[in-house]
């Protein structure tokens, strides 16, 4: 009985160490979740992914879609609806800022430091009666210098 408990405890400890080894360090995204992006060029992210604009020392992480009331595909709606995405932005080593962007023209972009971050696209559209699974979203962003 005691040997069985020791084996179980050993398995739990080994599993915990394995999961810890896969975690990111100090909030930094894993290398597989970071893609390179260029200033002024659209880049597309899945939830949890980060784009790094090295020339500007900027990072944009697509955290998640917080709301999606857009008109479903193959449905005729009176209003188009909107979706809201949450992003985390880090500029030149400063503290991370959390921002929200919407798919409506008046709220699709915001200023982050000396930059303008625009939500250029969010796919897929929902299907009637079936919401989009969070992991299926893809958001396209563009980072440009803010107008002076």
Q: Language-model features: where?
A:
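C-terminal motif of bacterial Sec signal peptides marking the signal peptidase cleavage site
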Residues: 18-21
């Amino acid at each position: 009985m005691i040997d069985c408990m020791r084996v179980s405890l050993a398995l739990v400890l080994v599993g915990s160490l394995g999961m810890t080894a896969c975690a990111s360090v100090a909030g930094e995204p894993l290398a597989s979740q970071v893609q390179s992006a260029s200033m002024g060029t659209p880049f597309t992210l899945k939830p949890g992914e980060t784009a790094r604009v090295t020339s500007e020392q900027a990072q944009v992480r697509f955290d998640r879609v917080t709301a999606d009331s857009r008109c479903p595909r193959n449905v005729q709606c009176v209003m188009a609806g909107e979706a809201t995405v949450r992003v985390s932005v880090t500029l030149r080593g400063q503290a991370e800022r959390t921002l929200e962007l919407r798919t409506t023209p008046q709220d699709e972009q915001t200023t982050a430091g000396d930059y303008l971050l625009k939500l250029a696209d969010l796919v897929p559209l929902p299907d009637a009666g079936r919401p989009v699974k969070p992991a299926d979203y893809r958001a396209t962003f563009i980072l440009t210098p803010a107008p002076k």
